[in-house]
């Protein structure tokens, strides 16, 4: 069927902010889809609230709306633009849910908009647990015994029939939110109550637990002519019971017999046909390891995390082709862009093994529950490609950036045997390392299989790795053994440790003896046809398929897996850097390992190397390609951390020099630079011992901000108010020594201001200045940022610009620079300088119209900013007000304190833009998922230091008709100020206490500021968690509360009686 000519304009719904369960894979899918539709000649309108994405760039769609993804706002856009059709299957769960809402509210019918791709009925059949089960029964496809429940009573009734364990899956939620496995009544009550609350339709599916079965996924595609193919089948190494987003996954499956593979393949194709899906779809199945019994677990009728992985694993662009199927094209008339010859209806074949390992945020959340289950906890993932499973696994392990270069983890090495067994029986994020350790201690594969339910095949492969360690230990310096170890995927660092050599020694020996990797192409057809795509992975074989061209090249280092503190913003900058290199006439080569992102789409760069971002793996590419240089500014801390080692190995770094990077990152050199430039910073010093830290704090006076040197996303930063707290921090948060000094700074309360600038050694361009709503002390990534600044005087703005220009020139910055200032009165202090691309670059680029990464890259390559038409100073302010609001994934992470501080906790961001600050902030808050109620009750419980300030806020809440609830201490303060308030009992008092008030939904907002004491048992912690579990906005900073009040005040008319406020003379 040729493409449809009866539609012209298509609205694409994006997936909104990055949260756990819905990350960069949808930016990749959405970008591909918009470009594919434009390629076919349609007009594309995109709506998405996430400014950090490539897809919200103006060149991706014909019109881009960065507005909240809510029924109200999207309906307005539809009424204004009158699109012919809407494509919701590329916006994750958010896009699907929104399409269902728009249809139910009658908006689509009213405006004559049809849904493209998979039809609404099919979406509902796959997503609604009852309809799905009915369809499976009709098809004769087995599903686990289950019941749909709407209350706890119904849950009890089901469990009486089939017994524990049972799995709870809430309907229409994302990444298994609210779900879990229950093994007893207490867990049932807790998980079912949460699940019902979090499901938008208040229903859960309870099913017999088949935990322990093999979890297999098929990524399938179908068109309107009923052509259907399997793009990729994948096997989860972790058995059923762990969310597939948290599982280690291999493609193609390794342990299925041909009969099992065909059995599950036929089931998947039968299901996608019965559902009538048009586009991409993901089918998850459970296979009994001991028989041919299987169950269908679920179907995602949309592009998903797994389809991004399948696209990158096979090279087959699922989202691009799904978008074209949606407008009527069929698989047998579309050419596969990878080979440029074969049609899209050929199933990809793989002659390599792909391994995906999730990246978890537990380095940021010490207290989080690390147990893995049906609710997703990973923020991102890495992928690696090798010729054997061992090679692929070890490459993926060293891509994770968790401080390991091999299957070796200190905690596992030092663990007692019983602890080790527990860690293997109950899966956590580090189970793989404990399994390796158990094998080293002589535990058998059989025992490990019994403990973990992981297939013996994978355990034997890990044993091969452990056996090779022994061979290496026994044959130091043996070149044949070295060759074999490299073939299994061992890193130079791992071999060096076993041979008591340095990593560079091993590299030198290999180079001398020609034990170097070759690069193979990812071509979708196991080398059967020649391929058009320059997409490579390394392995130790004979023939190299990556041909070096005559054109001078530049290598860009990507930012690796998404984690808190280093998100999609860095991928955005990487992609723009690559595009700018191409524009400048060089060959752009990228090295990265994140399967979710646009940067690892083979059509982004001239050449893509899917490799770990370690000095060794990057050097291999450099040795082959011989580029004119390497750019490290855009890959976040990942790339910056490789700079010193690369330069030591003779690599030319482009842009700001290593010496200048070091002057910005090294505390003492930085202070010296500041004093030479005459720029003030808060008093502070570096400590290399606990005693020294105490002495510095006493000298400059409390409160002080303490943090380790060289960190991203404020890891292990804290504000301490006295000696006791400082000692607690020094003992628990950091290991201080001369190699790892700790910075101790005077903490200044003031406004925080952030600036990004581009410099070329002479000209310094400042696209814009952002003012933070939360005062200094809240991590910049967790603050609400406003452009243009709302409360800064002209004098302060001039000072900020002056200091920025002086710093950029003084530190000889070539490329990007990010500075954070604190403003106290008319004094401006520098808090920190990052000589690289930052988290705010995409937001600022979009709202100011200054293509920052593009200009920075061209400056790095030698073009002067003045030649590009820019001059030193702050760019003219754009009309309108723009706010960047952080988005958190607290509902997914139990046991994590949501209070804001110097350590970053948000996973994503949204934008709000309008003509006034209040309207923009309203949109930003709504887009971030905060429901703003024009009336109701506010619950206040604030620390003593904040009570004075809370009085003014409480009075304003009362003025707009909010009822005030407060705990005793706060209530006393309010009563004394003459404000009417209802006292709520503290946690340990009689019911109804504060937790009951929150649970029963009697408060619309909770304002709770931190009393010191981070322990999970503290009252404040329990109040904040209770608010999150019940979906009530909980503000832990009075600044955020004040901003929200401004929004509420602007929405309500004031009602004052005529006598009030009249002054009698």
Curated annotation (Swiss-Prot):
It comes from the Bacteria. PROSITE patterns: ATP_GRASP (PS50975), CPSASE_1 (PS00866), CPSASE_2 (PS00867), MGS (PS51855). InterPro entries: ATP-grasp, ATP_grasp_subdomain_1, CarbamoylP_synth_lsu, CarbamoylP_synth_lsu_oligo, CarbamoylP_synth_lsu_oligo_sf, CbamoylP_synth_lsu-like_ATP-bd, CbamoylP_synth_lsu_CPSase_dom, MGS-like_dom. GO terms for biological process: 'de novo' UMP biosynthetic process; glutamine metabolic process; L-arginine biosynthetic process. Its cofactor is Mg(2+); Mn(2+). Mn(2+) 2 binds at residues 298, 300. Binds 4 Mg(2+) or Mn(2+) ions per subunit. The keyword Amino-acid biosynthesis applies. The keyword Repeat applies. Residues 930-1065 form the MGS-like domain. Mn(2+) 1 binds at residues 284, 298. Residues 402-546 are annotated as: Oligomerization domain. The large subunit is composed of 2 ATP-grasp domains that are involved in binding the 2 ATP molecules needed for carbamoyl phosphate synthesis. The N-terminal ATP-grasp domain (referred to as the carboxyphosphate synthetic component) catalyzes the ATP-dependent phosphorylation of hydrogencarbonate to carboxyphosphate and the subsequent nucleophilic attack by ammonia to form a carbamate intermediate. This is Carbamoyl phosphate synthase large chain. It comes from Bacillus caldolyticus. The lineage of its organism: Bacteria, Bacillati, Bacillota, Bacilli, Bacillales.
């Amino acid at each position: 069927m040729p493409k449809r000519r009866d539609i012209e304009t298509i609205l694409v719904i994006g997936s909104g902010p990055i949260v756990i369960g819905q990350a960069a894979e949808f930016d990749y899918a959405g970008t591909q889809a918009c470009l594919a539709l434009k390629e076919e000649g349609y007009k594309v309108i995109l709506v998405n609230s996430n400014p950090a994405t490539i897809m919200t760039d103006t060149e991706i769609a014909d019109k881009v709306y960065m507005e909240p993804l809510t029924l109200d706002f999207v309906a307005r856009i539809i009424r204004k633009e009158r699109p012919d059709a809407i494509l919701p299957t590329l916006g994750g769960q958010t896009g699907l849910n929104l399409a269902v809402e728009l249809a139910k509210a009658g908006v689509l019918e009213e405006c004559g908009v049809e849904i493209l791709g998979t039809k609404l009925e099919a979406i509902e059949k796959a997503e609604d647990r009852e309809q799905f089960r009915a369809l499976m029964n009709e098809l004769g496809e087995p599903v686990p015994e289950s019941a749909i429940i709407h209350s706890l009573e119904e849950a009890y009734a089901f469990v009486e029939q089939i017994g524990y364990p049972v799995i709870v899956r809430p309907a229409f939620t994302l990444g298994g939110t609210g779900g879990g496995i229950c093994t007893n009544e207490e867990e049932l009550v807790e998980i079912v109550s949460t699940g019902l609350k979090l499901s938008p339709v208040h229903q859960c599916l309870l099913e017999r637990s088949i935990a322990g079965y093999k979890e297999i996924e098929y990524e399938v595609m179908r068109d309107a002519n009923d052509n259907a193919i399997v793009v990729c089948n994948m096997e989860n190494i972790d058995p059923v019971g762990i969310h597939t987003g948290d599982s280690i996954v291999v493609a193609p499956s390794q342990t299925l017999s041909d009969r099992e593979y065909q059995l599950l393949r036929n089931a998947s194709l039968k299901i996608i046909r019965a559902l009538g899906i048009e586009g991409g779809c993901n089918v998850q199945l459970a296979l009994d390891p001991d028989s041919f019994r299987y169950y269908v677990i679920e179907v995602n009728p949309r592009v998903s995390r797994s389809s991004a992985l399948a696209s990158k694993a096979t090279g087959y662009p699922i989202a691009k082709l799904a978008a074209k199927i949606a407008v009527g094209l069929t698989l047998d008339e579309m050419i596969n862009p990878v080979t440029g010859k074969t049609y899209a209806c050929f199933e990809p074949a793989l002659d390599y093994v792909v391994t995906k390992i999730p990246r978890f945020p537990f380095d940021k959340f010490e207290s989080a529950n690390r147990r893995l289950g049906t609710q997703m906890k990973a923020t991102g993932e890495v992928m690696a490609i090798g010729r054997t499973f061992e090679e692929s696994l070890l490459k993926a392990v060293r891509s994770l950036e968790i401080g390991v270069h091999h299957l070796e983890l200190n905690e596992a090495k030092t663990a007692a045997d019983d602890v080790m067994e527990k860690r293997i029986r109950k899966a956590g994020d580090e189970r793989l390392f404990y399994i390796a350790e158990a094998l080293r201690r002589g535990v058998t594969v059989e025992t490990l299989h019994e403990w973990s339910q992981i297939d013996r095949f994978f355990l034997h492969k890990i044993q091969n790795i452990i056996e090779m360690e022994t061979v290496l230990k026994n044959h130091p310096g043996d070149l044949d053994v070295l060759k074999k170890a490299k073939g299994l995927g061992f890193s130079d660092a791992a071999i060096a440790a076993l041979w008591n050599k340095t990593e560079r020694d091993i590299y030198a020996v290999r180079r001398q003896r020609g034990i170097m990797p070759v690069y193979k192409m990812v071509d979708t057809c196991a080398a059967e046809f020649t391929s058009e795509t320059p997409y490579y992975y390394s392995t130790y074989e004979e023939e190299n398929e990556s041909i070096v061209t005559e054109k001078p090249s530049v290598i860009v280092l990507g930012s690796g897996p998404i984690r808190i503190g280093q998100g999609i913003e860095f991928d955005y900058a990487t992609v723009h850097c690559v595009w700018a290199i191409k524009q400048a006439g060089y060959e752009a080569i990228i090295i990265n390992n994140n399967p979710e992102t646009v940067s690892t789409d083979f059509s982004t760069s001239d050449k893509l190397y899917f490799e770990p971002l370690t000095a060794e793996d990057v050097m291999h590419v450099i040795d082959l390609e011989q580029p004119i240089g390497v750019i490290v500014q855009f890959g976040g801390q990942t790339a910056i951390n490789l700079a010193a080692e690369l330069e030591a190995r003779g690599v030319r770094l482009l842009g700001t020099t290593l010496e200048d990077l070091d002057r910005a990152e090294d505390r003492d050199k930085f202070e010296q630079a500041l004093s030479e430039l005459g720029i003030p910073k808060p008093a502070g010093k570096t400590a290399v011992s606990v005693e020294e830290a105490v002495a510095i704090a006493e000298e400059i006076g409390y409160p002080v901000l303490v943090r380790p040197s060289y960190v991203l996303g404020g890891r292990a930063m804290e504000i301490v108010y006295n000696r006791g707290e400082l000692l607690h921090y020094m003992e628990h948060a950091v290991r201080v020594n001369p190699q790892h000094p700790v910075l101790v700074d005077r903490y200044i309360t003031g406004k925080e201001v952030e600036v990004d600038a581009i410099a070329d050694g002479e000209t310094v361009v400042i696209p814009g200045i952002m003012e933070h709503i939360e005062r200094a002390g809240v991590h910049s990534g967790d603050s609400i940022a406003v452009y243009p600044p709302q409360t800064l005087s002209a004098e302060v703005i001039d000072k900020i610009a002056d200091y920025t220009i002086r710093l950029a020139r003084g530190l000889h910055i070539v490329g990007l620079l990010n500075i954070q200032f604190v403003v106290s009165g008319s004094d401006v202090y520098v808090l920190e300088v990052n000589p690289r691309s930052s988290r705010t670059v995409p937001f600022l680029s979009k709202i100011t119209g200054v293509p920052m990464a593009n200009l920075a890259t061209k400056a790095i390559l030698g073009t002067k900013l003045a030649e590009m038409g820019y001059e030193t100073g702050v760019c003219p302010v754009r009309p309108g007000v723009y706010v960047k609001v952080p988005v958190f994934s607290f509902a997914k992470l139990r046991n994590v304190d949501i209070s804001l501080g110097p350590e970053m906790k948000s996973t994503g961001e949204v934008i709000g833009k309008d003509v006034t600050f209040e309207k923009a902030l309203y949109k930003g808050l709504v887009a971030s998922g905060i429901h703003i109620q024009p009336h109701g009750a506010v619950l206040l419980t604030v620390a003593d230091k904040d009570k004075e300030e809370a009085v003014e806020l409480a009075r304003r809440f009362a003025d707009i008709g909010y009822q005030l609830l407060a705990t005793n201490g706060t209530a006393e303060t309010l009563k004394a100020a003459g404000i009417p308030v209802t006292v709520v009992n503290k946690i340990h008092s009689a019911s109804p206490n504060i937790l009951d008030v929150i649970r029963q939904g009697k408060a619309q907002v909770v304002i709770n500021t931190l009393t010191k004491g981070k322990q999970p048992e503290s009252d404040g912690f329990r109040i904040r968690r209770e608010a999150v579990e019940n979906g009530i906005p909980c503000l832990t900073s009075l600044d955020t509360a004040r901003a929200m009040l401004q929004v509420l005040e602007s929405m309500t008319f004031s009602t004052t009686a005529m006598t009030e406020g009249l002054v009698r003379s």
